Amino acid sequence: MLPAHKHTLETLLTDVVKQVAQATQGESEAAFIAPAITLERPKVAAHGDVACNVAMQLAKPMRANPRQLAQQIVDALLADPLAKGLVDGAEVAGPGFINLRLSAASKQAVIAAVFAQREAFGRSQREAGKRVLVEFVSANPTGPLHVGHGRQAALGDAMSNVLASQGFDVHREFYYNDAGVQIGNLAISTQARARGLKPGDPGWPEAAYNGEYIADIARDYLNGETVSASDGEPVKGAGDVEDLEAIRRFAVAYLRHEQDMDLQAFGVKFDQYYLESSLYKEGRVEKTVNELIAAGKTYEQEGALWLRTTDDGDDKDRVMRKSDGTYTYFVPDVAYHETKWERGFTKVINIQGSDHHGTIARVRAGLQGLGIGIPKGYPDYVLHKMVTVMRDGQEVKISKRAGSYVTVRDLIEWSGGAVPGQEAAPDLLDEETIRRGRDAVRFFLISRKADTEFVFDVDLALKQNDENPVYYVQYAHARICSVINEWKSRYGADETGLPVVDLSPLDSERATALLQKLAEFPDMLTHAAGELAPHAVAFYLRDLAGEFHSFYNAERVLVDDEAQRNARIALLAATRQVLANGLAVIGVSAPAKM
């Protein structure tokens, strides 16, 4: 049911309930407060198109038999002139459910709505004027992005698109942890490679990174190459093996550039890259710590500075500043989130791995301790579980590129069908291979709830049949494009007249099911935004593709009867648009040919 029709029906039922209350209880309509009307689609098609339980909600307070009350509501609704054209019939079922049958015209109205709104169909402005910051990926610049980062990128970008579909002003942000111990390990790893050492050699640092990418960084540093991240200044390799700081700067810039390339291949863009190091350079960390001290939220013990996190629900107080003067890792996180609040983002969503669960209470407690009006649940967190990669029936745990894990780029190349010799050499890959791999990876990685573990089956991603969910959905779009092109060619037709086509021939069971699924798209997006659940879009697209394939397999489209043919083409054109709109939300292409 379209949102406009749903709102109309909810209003009608609310008014009718008030009328029934007045007639049976003698209570004035103005004084009677009707419960919120909830409309749901019955699980069994034979039970109608919409179900409502308002009679059972009111039975006790009105001291009425729920079935009798439901019948009174049904009679009053069907007698209301405003219900004509929207409701075809209604009946009472079970203990007092009201099952409604919508008119054929109201079901078919979704096609006109799709044609009128096109790419905007499904979108809403209900959250217009509200700003939200979505932080995701936020990888250390110490290596290529791994598949966990890929899941974050797919979730974060899709979630941002879902929120934007409801009118939110969405700000995508990547937080670079470029000031920790890992950066020091990156520098000594690159230095060791520059000295000609490799993993396993005497003198190879114990904490070093072993991936082949370290050798690439060292080579370019020695050759005096220049690298830069998308938002950074160019850094030239100094070539001095002894200058560890120069090596560090070059290695960080090199890997930030590599991560930029990974994200570009994945089709993900950010509005801002925020560097942890800037928090120290600008004195933000010290400022936040001093504010917490001034607020009386800290104490000193055994030479360390502690934060009273138990005041805000943590299981124990936490060390902020160690006895050697260095800060624990969650302190800059508190400072960083204070900047989010100060920048005007009253709604913030962090997408992180489930291994970050322990930091949530600490960060929130630190923000509460500042006493600047930040809500207790700030920020929101969406934690995702790990991704296991399967290829050729075996779990893949390492790659040559990274040394100890599978990278996002590995996954894109494998899922795109890269042949041996192309892997780890993106310049050898054609755009179609990258697109196919990107589509598969993005669709797969949001096709499960974030808090469930996910097995990424590369072999499944390569299949071109109904077993592969992204192929199944994209093929529905391509199949429709093919049919419409054939219609244009065979009958000399064009799509300009489709918005005014007579839709009354769309009265079959399969056509009706497809129409109803199309009408669910706007509410699905609203639900996905409210629940921070982008996987709902993937679920919906699979269901929509299924309804289309069922319709197409049951009913021939290019029939001799012109009215029936044009009505079915209009249905297909609307389905094509909604498939494209949904795929765009999750960052997946809608190919016209496959």
UniProtKB/Swiss-Prot annotation:
Its EC number is 6.1.1.19. It is an enzyme of class 6 (ligase). PROSITE patterns: AA_TRNA_LIGASE_I. Gene3D superfamilies: Arginyl tRNA synthetase N-terminal domain, HUPs, Isoleucyl-tRNA Synthetase, Domain 1. Keywords: Aminoacyl-tRNA synthetase, ATP-binding, Cytoplasm, Ligase, Nucleotide-binding, Protein biosynthesis. The keyword Transmembrane helix does not apply. Transmembrane segments: none annotated. Pfam families: Arg_tRNA_synt_N, DALR_1, tRNA-synt_1d. InterPro entries: aa-tRNA-synth_I_CS (IPR001412), Arg-tRNA-ligase (IPR001278), Arg-tRNA-synth_N (IPR005148), Arg-tRNA-synth_N_sf (IPR036695), ArgRS_core (IPR035684), DALR_anticod-bd (IPR008909), Rossmann-like_a/b/a_fold (IPR014729), tRNAsynth_Ia_anticodon-bd (IPR009080). GO terms for cellular component: cytoplasm. It catalyses: tRNA(Arg) + L-arginine + ATP = L-arginyl-tRNA(Arg) + AMP + diphosphate. A motif ('HIGH' region) lies at residues 139-149. One of its GO terms (molecular function) is ATP binding. CDD domains: Anticodon_Ia_Arg (cd07956), ArgRS_core (cd00671). It is found in: Cytoplasm. It comes from the Bacteria. HAMAP family: Arg_tRNA_synth. Belongs to the class-I aminoacyl-tRNA synthetase family. NCBIfam families: argS. Monomer. This is Arginine--tRNA ligase. The gene is argS.
